[in-house]
Amino acid sequence: VNHNYICKYNIGSFASNLKYAEDARDLQDNWMSLFDVNLVSINEQFNPLISMDMVWANNLTTHWDINRRRDVSLSLVNAQLSETSGNEIVLGLGYRFGNLPIFLKSKQLNNDINVQFDFSIRKNNTIIRRITENVDQLTAGEKVMSIKVSADYTFNNRLNLRLFYDRKVDTPYLSLSYPTTNTNFGLSIRYTLMQ
């Protein structure tokens, strides 16, 4: 079981307020601040909010993750709040086939093949909130579905062979951008020169 939380608070830019005086007020009878701040942002992530990895006695592995993210930026120049949020769920399943024989010429190798399948759904959206006008507007967003399948075979401690297939389907919430699909597949051979 795993959990991680990260939060960052940033002040984009600030300058000394030349009109500042102790106990001074502005025209709306608000206290005057020592600094003029233009932008404040908060970035928080639960990456993962909760995650669980399990290895079963029959060489089966399962895992699932729930991730959350939120970025909030307050612009004090134009009184706008920009909020970007994202939610993701990842489900994974793997299996290790032990001592699988592979014949190369007159030599037989008995190594393991690790097969991994991951499926994820991520939803992102960006909302602009105009505070003085009391208007909220969705300006960006998407739903991303991803499938990743791979099989790894280790010939020895230096040589590894990997077959993979990745597919990502991106469906936007707004009609300003087009749905896209990306597919990657292939074979990779990794040879390690150093130990």
Regions found by a protein language model. Name each.
Residues 2-195:
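Exposed, low-structure sequence patches enriched in small/polar residues
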